[in-house]
């Protein structure tokens, strides 16, 4: 709170949709600027202005929806400040449910920046993951369930892949936000704990990895703070004010 009062912008970067990220941003009192969908979108909520937006090509997106439909996967589409899906996994998602026809209409007509595909079946999602990698140029899995790369992890209730344009990264979005506000690389700090945060680290000499990050992530950052459980982000911000 002291940082925001003193003019420091605390900008949330999230794999969530803009709608979900803005709810979280308001809850924690961060600045009204959001990088969402793993960097596919950046938005200034104060001015209601799109800063950066990287759309998935409609034909490609329609192919993903068709594959998910044939294989019984759940599909979520992130666009603007909206989020829709064919099947809710949780009760609070019920109002977001819609038909495949509506999903296909949105794929054609809206600026969809991220398609989240998920399922309870780990093996089926492994096949989907390979399908995306082998069948589509111009697409990338921006984020995914950790068990895909570490099969020894405890099973989850659901497994997901966040699919976006291969031009998307949190680093690109951070760069766009810096240009928008007129920040230099020396004037920002980036903080993260995941593989998809490394691209942000490259945007500034002031990069910070969380204490709970994997060793390979910590090696990419200039500094390391304590873990999430030990208020690692707060400790970085306290050094500013």
Residues covered by each model-derived region:
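Conserved acidic, metal-coordinating active-site core of Asp-based
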Residues: 67, 71-74, 78-191, 195-198, ...
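Short, polar loop motifs at secondary-structure junctions
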Residues: 39, 146-147, 211-215
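Active-site phosphate-binding/coordination module
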Residues: 1-93
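Residue-level signal for inorganic ion chemistry
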Residues: 3, 14, 38, 115, ...
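Short, hydrophobic alpha-helical segments
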Residues: 178-181, 237-241
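Phosphate- and divalent-cation-binding pockets in alpha/beta enzyme and binding domains
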Residues: 20-23, 127, 173, 199-200, ...
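Short, structured coil segments at secondary-structure junctions
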Residues: 28-30, 38, 46, 136, ...
């Amino acid at each position: 709170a002291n940082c925001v009062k003193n003019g420091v912008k605390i900008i949330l970067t999230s794999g969530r949709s803009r709608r979900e990220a803005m709810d979280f941003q308001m809850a924690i009192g961060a600045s009204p600027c959001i990088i969402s969908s793993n960097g596919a979108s950046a938005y200034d909520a104060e001015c209601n202005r799109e800063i950066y937006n990287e759309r998935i090509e409609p034909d490609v997106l329609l192919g993903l929806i068709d594959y998910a439909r044939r294989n019984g996967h759940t599909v979520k589409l992130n666009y603007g400040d909206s989020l829709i899906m064919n099947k809710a996994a949780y009760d609070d998602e019920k109002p977001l449910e819609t038909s495949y026809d509506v999903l296909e209409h949105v794929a054609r007509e809206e600026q969809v920046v991220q398609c989240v595909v998920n399922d309870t079946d780990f093996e089926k999602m492994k096949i989907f993951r390979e399908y995306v990698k082998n069948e589509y140029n111009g697409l990338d899995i921006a984020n995914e369930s950790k068990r895909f790369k570490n099969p020894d992890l405890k099973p989850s209730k659901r497994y997901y892949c966040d699919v976006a344009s291969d031009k998307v990264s949190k680093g690109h979005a951070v760069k766009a936000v810096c240009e928008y506000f007129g920040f230099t690389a020396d004037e920002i700090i980036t903080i993260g704990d995941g593989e998809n945060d490394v691209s942000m680290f490259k945007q500034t000499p002031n990069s910070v990895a969380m204490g709970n990050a994997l060793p390979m992530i910590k090696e990419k950052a200039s500094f390391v703070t304590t873990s999430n459980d030990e208020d690692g982000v707060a400790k970085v911000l306290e050094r500013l004010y």
